[in-house]
Structure formats: structure tokens, C-alpha cells
Amino acid sequence: MSVRKSLRCFSILLAAVCTLPLCTGCSIPFLEQEESDGSGYLFTASLAANPKSLDPQSATDAASKTIIENLYEGLVELDENGSPQLAAAENYTVSPDGLTYTFTLKSDRFWFYDANADDVVDDDEKWQVTADDYVYAFQRIFDPQTQSCLQNADAVQSGQLAPEEIGVRAVSSTVLQFSLSRPDAEFFSNLASTAAMPCSETFFQQTKGRYGLDKDSVASCGAFYLRLWFYDHYGNQNQIFMRRNSVNAEARRVYPTNLT
């Protein structure tokens, strides 16, 4: 393997990332339904603060991460017991020396951006999630222009190491490989962090610096997509409205049609 730059700084950072439940103090009447596909229901939840950014690679506040976890899906997720399990990845292997992690992506994961806001999936509004999306996400984490708060990323941010030299590469469109400088028992679970979620480079560039800052600059690859983001700095009627993302295979699971 030619790429063997340090990913341990990423692992250290992500170990400190925590997640929040979707809802605090809200009622869930539809859970009384014994048989339902979840459609037609609206799940309402309250956040302690307004999300500052829905960019997985730069969001640091708890409110933002709560929304991000519903809009995006990474390689790994935490189950109800806090244990890591595969999400967008079909399987993975670890080399005998513990330095190489290879993930095979599921083929039924897609990005969706409702460009005309009609809640209909047009052919040009969805595209495949690929290994390159994860590579670009990790490059953004370490890119000096991102002004990341990552610990131990000084070498990259100072320009001594180019973001492209980070130890992650796309072997193919569906195979992603990480190279570590030393074994890290926490690396797999740290991939459940929001920062490790994919980023579509083409869409990112189209947002012209607005990525994750408003409804029109968010493309979803998770269970829901962003339908409305009303944000008033001086008011208390702020609202985020998400709809179930039908292009994602997770739509087969039981959950409500809408979140607000």
C-alpha cells in the first residue's frame, strides 16, 4: 500500500464525538400502531438550540449533529446499545497487522437533492453514493481551508501534508480503504461519527461555499431529506422539516413519513 499517512488524529478526534437522541420530551402517538409502514405520520421533536450547520465535516454542536444523523448515513452507526454496526457498508475486513481497513459499500445507497422542491424523485436528482464521496469527506476534514478543529492535524493544516495524502483511498466505486499508521482498536467505532459521513464533491462545489447552511445546500443520503429550514435569529418559531427519503433503502424500515 502506497498511502500510509496518519489517521490516528482522526480517530482521536472522533472518540470525543457524542450523539443525541432524536427527541427530548415529545410524544409519539403512532408507536401505538401495531402494524404500519410509518407513512402518513409526522414526528415532532424539540431541539435545545438551532443547528448551526448541517455540514457533517464541520458541525460541532449537538443540535446540528442530531439533524445530520437523520439526513446522512455513514459506513458505521451505533445501535440502541451504543455498539457500532455496519450501516452503508456491506462488509469490511481488517489486515492481520491492524493497519488496513477495507470496506465494501452497499449498492442501494443514493444521494437525493429535491431541486424543484416537488417531493418527486427525478432521474437527475439522485445519484449513487461512492467510495470517492468518503475520500472527499476525509480530505475536507484535514483541508486547511476547512479550518477544522481536529486534534493532531497541524501537519495537514500547515500545508506540510496535502489533504490528498491522507490514508484513505477509493479502490473502486464501491470499495474504500483506510491505512493507519498504527493499530487503533477504536477506529471502527469512531467511523460512526457524523464527521465520517460521505460528502459528494460535485454537489459540494455547486453550493459555492454554502454547503450545509440552508435548505438549498444540503443533499441527503440518509433516511430523510431536508424539505424546509426556517431560521430566524430573533424569533422562536424556527423549524426544520424533513421528509422520508424514498431513494434510500432504509425507507423499507418503519419510521414516520415526516420529521419536524
Regions found by a protein language model. Name each.
Residues 27-29:
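Bacterial signal peptide processing site
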Residues 90-148:
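Aromatic- and charge-enriched surface segment that lines or borders ligand/interaction sites
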Residues 132-133, 140-142, 146-203:
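Surface-exposed binding/hinge segments that line
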Residues 2-12:
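Bacterial N-terminal signal peptides that target proteins for export
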Residues 21-25:
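C-terminal motif of bacterial Sec signal peptides marking the signal peptidase cleavage site
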Residues 46-96, 219-221:
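N-terminal lobe/hinge region of extracytoplasmic solute-binding protein
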Residues 173, 184-258:
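Gly/Pro-rich hinge or "lid" segments in bacterial periplasmic/extracellular proteins
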Residues 39-49, 100-103, 134, 176-177, ...:
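Short, well-ordered beta-strand elements
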